[in-house]
Amino acid sequence: MSTQMSVFLSTQAAQPQWGEKALISFAEQGATIHLQQTQDFSAIQRAARKLDNQGIRTAFLAGEGWDLESIWAFYQGYRDAKKRNTVEWKALAAAEQVELEARIKATDWTRDIINKSAEEVAPRQLATMAAEFIKSLAPDHVSYRIVKDKDLLTEGWEGIYAVGRGSERTSAMLQLDYNPTGDENAPVFACLVGKGITFDSGGYSLKPSNMMSAMKADMGGSGMITGALGLAIMRGFNKRVKLILCCAENMVSGRALKLGDIITYKNGKTVEIMNTDAEGRLVLADGLIYASEQKPQLIIDCATLTGAAKNALGNDYHALLSYDESLSQQALAAAKEENEALWALPLAEFHREMLPSNFADLSNISNGDYTPGASTAAAFLSYFVEGYQKGWLHFDCSATYRKSASDKWAAGATGMGVKMLARILMQQA
């Protein structure tokens, strides 16, 4: 079969020889995607996956019906980690073309950096690459610093340093300031905090190989939240925002974090380490303390934080946890408007009491049988957010990465959540 093909949309059923309710049929002029209803974006994305699997390397979206959202759905399904495919389409209206190109630029960056190997993206490289991406979009409005290695201790960022001290690759914290106001004293509207664990072996609480194989993607929260800020900037976002990425590699060595160690955080909280594989919350705590120091109206953190969230929701939804019910409802509405899957998991005050330690203020994991891991992880983070009951959203990113392909997604990073977070920023401003 040719590696180039025109692709058409139709709401008419395929001819019988293609099978009952066939999604795709082929003819001399190209392939036709048969939709059960107009604007069936899921079907378009599934059809794009089928075309990729059949070796079609260039698709021209021809005929009627290809608007912004249908082109986007096709692009999402057609793209794979090897970036072998090219999509071409007829010109859209100017505003729609700008929006489509912005989506592609932001999500491609997110998917690419998550798909890179841990050898390519060490903690300092992640911080640098994220900063350079955002600065490329608004060079006159972005400044940043990267705090690394022993400087983390000097400035009080004990969690990031402790998690990464077992690796030969130094840990880093990105502190990026996007300030389009022209006023260096302008208030910070929002702080965006990302977990940036560039590889997670589990530390001494070692992961089995089948659980470790995808852990280059444990920085997916940083990738997602950086991409979202980039998309918001390209959409014209004009409020001051700080991006904080907490970057480390969780490895085993004679210097690595051990069970029973106690971390003393900048806000005075002490944490006993009862599981070194619950490291994401340890680095995020530093980022949330820094975010709280900025006194923003809004704090959003993103992290591939718990297996519990993925067990609950699979790879198809991101999890949302927040004490702010009104803000949560607005976030869920934003996700729906962007056609991205988000589901709220419970977070209550009693979850904060499920992290007892005999030697510190908190344990880094909850105790007991059948504890709600995603909820207690979010509750742990709340101890590092000033005024945690209002203006804070925590995303446990279950849908950033897929170890194997599905009918809608190639294996690897998805870019899901970038549009949703960008919309939340725009709507809250």
UniProtKB/Swiss-Prot annotation:
Probably plays an important role in intracellular peptide degradation. Its cofactor is Mn(2+). The keyword Magnesium does not apply. Keywords: Aminopeptidase, Cytoplasm, Hydrolase, Manganese, Metal-binding, Protease. Mn(2+) 2 binds at residues 195, 200, 218, 279. The active site is at residues 207, 281. Disulfide bonds: none annotated. GO terms for cellular component: cytoplasm. It comes from Vibrio cholerae serotype O1 (strain ATCC 39315 / El Tor Inaba N16961). Homohexamer. Its EC number is 3.4.11.23. This is Peptidase B. Mn(2+) 1 binds at residues 200, 277, 279.
